[in-house]
Amino acid sequence: MSYTQKVLEELKARYPEQPEFIQAATEILGTIQPALDAHPEYEEAALLERLVEPERIVMFRVPWVDDQGKVQVNRGYRVEFNSAIGPYKGGLRFNPTVTLGMLKFLGLEQILKNSLTTLPMGGGKGGSDFDPKGKSNSEIMHFCQSFMTELYRHIGPNTDVPAGDLGVGGREVAYLFGQYKRLTNEWTGVLTGKGLSFGGSLARTEATGYGLVYFVDEYLKSRGESFEGKNVVVHGSGNVAIYAVQKVAQLGGKVLACSDTHGWVEDPDGIDYTVLEHVYNKKRSGHDKGVTLAMYVDEKPNAVWHEGDGRGVWQLPCDIALPCARENTLLLEDAQALVANGCKVVGEGANMPTTIEATTYFQENGVAFMPGKAANAGGVLVSGLEMSQNAEHLSWTFEEVDGKLEQLMRGMFHNVDDTAKEYGQEGNFVMGANIAGFLKVADAMLAQGVC
């Protein structure tokens, strides 16, 4: 039994109730054995055993009062996973599906993702099973203030810097930041994704979607191709999807379809990101109950709305597929449909949206598969640039931030590509990303001793 298999079997026995975490660990550990073979000192230092266990987990109750005066109680978490290369960095997710296992999966992925950015950021993740959907602004503010009243003692600009994630946008980050400032009497860059009027960075909103497209475009360039004339399908219609759609169009491609939890929309003229943005903002406002992507056809009469599972987008013929919604939303049967319909490139805009079976099928059938820990790192990358701006007490222009984002994402592709080639796995970008991200963290942990 190999070192990675041994550690994985121990994890499965220890955490049988955390399937998402086991899935992430399986995907990562299953690809880094070549690096471990080249560095036997890692096993001697029990480095993997330390890597897969968080340095610290904070769990707490979050009591708050709703608009009817009734006390509600949710559960809050912060998984401070690894700080070998910098302060813990990773988003907060507010969603009823949030569990400790899910946050450990996201935190483990975040370690390698942050390492790949080349910026000094460790890995962490947090959140709550609170559901912001259908809540008033007042209720969301009360919840965020209660959440931060416990979290504030565990974070700081040089300790742990949270950001937004699913269910946590600019509004929630602002409420969290305000409460942190109130409790500590300090204005520090303790959160990223802030508003522009209080320390936020230009291009942060666009960063994940733009970064995804820059990464995929650099792959296409390495093959002597471009987005020009390519047909693209996108799963999702949130922040990542909107700006991926915009950047694809700017580079000459056409997005044929996108989706939400109620169905999917197909536009033969190409999805208009401004309409997507309008629908997304109405959803986020909290004033319009029942807003869905079906509204798209009100403004674009040539478009067709398909009620049902948003995974219907995977049935369309396309050159490039960009899953930008949630984990495990591109299944084996979807991969089979995409391959049958001519898809050549898949770039993950979300965290682990593709199942292991689907990923394997893509790789076995010659599809260039770009894993999320590299392809969607644009968001955390610009979060790191926001931390730099806060530390310098400066604000950079949109063009400066976007330029750094593009440069770093394109450089990241070559790091991943070169690492895959170095370990005899040319074209295996999953292995390239995992090994490249792992090596930097592993060397830092080794140098710092048993800690």
Feature locations, PLM:
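N-terminal ligand-binding/catalytic initiation module
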Residues: M1-L202, K440-G449
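Glycine-rich phosphate/diphosphate-binding loop of Rossmann-like nucleotide-binding domains
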Residues: G200-Q315
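Solvent-exposed alpha-helices and their adjacent loops that cap or buttress functional pockets
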Residues: V52-P54, D67-V71, P120-G122, T188, ...
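Adenosine-phosphate binding glycine-rich loop
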Residues: S2-P19, A24, A337-C451
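General beta-strand structural signal in soluble alpha/beta enzymes
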Residues: T159-A163, W187-L191, V234, A257-D260, ...
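Rossmann-like adenosine-cofactor binding region
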Residues: G263-F369, A374
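Predominant activation on well-ordered alpha-helical scaffold segments within soluble catalytic domains
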Residues: L8-E9, T26, L100, K104-L108, ...
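Active-site nucleophile and cofactor-binding loops and adjacent substrate-binding regions
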Residues: G69, D165-L166, S201-T208, V233-S237, ...
